[in-house]
Amino acid sequence: MPAENQNTGQDRSSNSISKNGNSQVGCHTVPNEELNITVAVRCRGRNEREISMKSSVVVNVPDITGSKEISINTTGDTGITAQMNAKRYTVDKVFGPGASQDLIFDEVAGPLFQDFIKGYNCTVLVYGMTSTGKTYTMTGDEKLYNGELSDAAGIIPRVLLKLFDTLELQQNDYVVKCSFIELYNEELKDLLDSNSNGSSNTGFDGQFMKKLRIFDSSTANNTTSNSASSSRSNSRNSSPRSLNDLTPKAALLRKRLRTKSLPNTIKQQYQQQQAVNSRNNSSSNSGSTTNNASSNTNTNNGQRSSMAPNDQTNGIYIQNLQEFHITNAMEGLNLLQKGLKHRQVASTKMNDFSSRSHTIFTITLYKKHQDELFRISKMNLVDLAGSENINRSGALNQRAKEAGSINQSLLTLGRVINALVDKSGHIPFRESKLTRLLQDSLGGNTKTALIATISPAKVTSEETCSTLEYASKAKNIKNKPQLGSFIMKDILVKNITMELAKIKSDLLSTKSKEGIYMSQDHYKNLNSDLESYKNEVQECKREIESLTSKNALLVKDKLKSKETIQSQNCQIESLKTTIDHLRAQLDKQHKTEIEISDFNNKLQKLTEVMQMALHDYKKRELDLNQKFEMHITKEIKKLKSTLFLQLNTMQQESILQETNIQPNLDMIKNEVLTLMRTMQEKAELMYKDCVKKILNESPKFFNVVIEKIDIIRVDFQKFYKNIAENLSDISEENNNMKQYLKNHFFKNNHQELLNRHVDSTYENIEKRTNEFVENFKKVLNDHLDENKKLIMQNLTTATSAVIDQEMDLFEPKRVKWENSFDLINDCDSMNNEFYNSMAATLSQIKSTVDTSSNSMNESISVMKGQVEESENAISLLKNNTKFNDQFEQLINKHNMLKDNIKNSITSTHSHITNVDDIYNTIENIMKNYGNKENATKDEMIENILKEIPNLSKKMPLRLSNINSNSVQSVISPKKHAIEDENKSSENVDNEGSRKMLKIE
């Protein structure tokens, strides 16, 4: 049944009576059948700008309709190549430039309109680039000509006209409401609210105008009663009129309302609702204006002051949005024209009348279902602002800001479409107010149709492709349409009666006197509200005084904290100095350990070289003695055999002749004895000199070696002592670190950080307190709770910041502390290894020296024995009877030898030559061996002397006393002793060779 006020009836009610659970009898839905969004593409003809630019047509569409495929040539090719390379998009319907407005309505909006009459929520969206005909498609020519629409009328006028024609034919009771909102620069605006479009912030009755806000339906029950009472005062007419004010036809329809028995469940819900309404009405002041929607939907959870969603699913509703009741299409068209006048429109290079905002025209239908029940359905007609290229449209300043906001909201809409198509787990509805408003239409419980408008010109081919991409993706979005919920008729009738009584009372009070007046009850109610507000102001003042005193205490605490922070800063600086000192010591210790390690390696190599040199020297000495003995023995045996052979030959071949041979034999005998004595004397002198030199040089050499070993031992003891001191310093720093962790870690006051949070908290509290004083309609308890939450949140943030700061300060100290432990352990292990290695090396050197000393003593003893044996050789020669007998036989055989004397002399000369050769051979062998050995030893000694300066440069100061001179003093005696032994050996060899020649 239509409901009408004489002045069209402004309805400032912010509540929709269809959402509250207690006011809805039931919600009948069809099975959860998923339906895809219907997508249609409308391509206009080229406009004057595109024709003047001579931009060719690149979009291939039918002239009117018929095909479901649209292709666009973006390559610039022609003929078959253009058809092969063209991009193709498939949608549900395609309309060309020849398609009329009536055809668009019948094909796209008509099916949704029938579902809307049946009780479904429906949405029609127009999407596309600027200047492609979106507003023309949705609105067109909204005027009536002789009671008829023109051919250019858009979807909204046709829906309004067809709606009332259909309702009159069905002859059912109904109520129709309209609302018109605009989204401009991400701000919602009610286009039907004349006060919000003026310069004043208050309405004609002195009420403050409130901004539109979007809420989820799940938060509807949490709205406070103060907001409901404020919204009630803005109410004008939200229900059907009485019979006296209705037209005859409307009155006839109204009489058809009758009350029948309801099911028990419906009666119980109705009785509960009546009881709740009676309690709420008795508690409110009689003079205050009543909010129709709030009184209809009161529950135990409180009254609402916003337009609630139409169902109990997770939808959205808009707070402070006005809904206007209409009884015919003309009233709806008047509201549409009123809203369009206030819509943001500007001129750009691409469009002379470019819409700079998104608009949603909503039609809400309360249609009688059966008996006392009315079904609620909605139809949202959305005209989206067009996306545009700022450079091409020439938008500057405010126009550029508008274009950016439009493109941003459309970009978010594109992301929502992509997420729905990809079935993503997160749909970014909340990133834009546009997507929040369209949340039910995209993937929700609404039947939706999308009309994409495009331009055929090549100059806009890029935007056309983008529009078609989104349209083809939106075709894959699935919705689950549901029938609307129910509301009871008696609730509507009661609210109508209360609202009309209030309006008549105010009207009579106004007519009785000049100016604007109100009834006595209304005046008393206003006074009581003022007294309540005064009490709230007093409470706010007391709260401000309390906060001021608390602020003074906080200032004092802040001063104390500053002093504490200064002392802590001094301690921190001292601690930083200590840490730097410890770091320097650790670096120095690390370098020292590296130098010690390098020196240790070099010393080990030198020790190995010395051991190898001594071993090689001993080996060569033994080989030389063995070779010399073997060679001498071999030559002497050879010489002896030759002499015996010659003597035998002389004995066999000689003929005793009577010659004067006796003097010669005596001479030979004397000469032999003389040679033996000479050889004995020289041998004694040689061995005595050798023994004397060895006895004189050996003690010096061993004393020097022992002194150097003692020096090395003292140096190593000093080094070990210094290492121990460094380790004790490190241990002391470790104890200091432990003391810091025990006394200071997590015990810093961090008062400066707390003061910052306290200051910010105080500023926020002061700001919110000022807002609280200015907006005294809000409840003080809610304000205090919010302040408490804010303080707790800031304290939590401050605590977290203190903990994070303390951990950040401690982290480098902890890492250095752990590294110092590793360095201490490495230093300790390396020190022990170095000490053990040097001790073992010194022990080996000492054992080697002892062995060498024993060997030399044994050699001296052997040489003394050989000298004593040589002294006995002469006496043995004198007492040798065989020797004397031989000489006697020589005398007897003098005659025999006389004939062969020449041959014997010749043979003797040849043997003398052989002995000379033997001597030369022995001398060459000794020289070659001595030269090689001396060269090898000299080379080894030179290498050692070269390494000593390099080591002394890299050694620590406490080891610098071990230099090349000390090593030279150790090596030189050994070198001289070896050279003396070689010379003595050569002298002995030469003397022995000479004596052998003399003997021969």
Curated annotation (Swiss-Prot):
Stretches with biased composition (Polar residues): 1-26, 261-276, 302-312
Predominant location category: cytoplasm
Keywords assigned: ATP-binding, Cell cycle, Cell division, Coiled coil, Cytoplasm, Cytoskeleton, Microtubule, Mitochondrion, Mitosis, Motor protein, Nucleotide-binding, Phosphoprotein
GO molecular function term, any single one: microtubule motor activity
PROSITE patterns in alphabetical order: KINESIN_MOTOR_1, KINESIN_MOTOR_2
Biased segments, Basic and acidic residues type: 976-1000
Name the UniProt record assigns to this protein: Kinesin-like protein CIN8
Taxonomic classification: Eukaryota, Fungi, Dikarya, Ascomycota, Saccharomycotina
Gene for this chain: CIN8
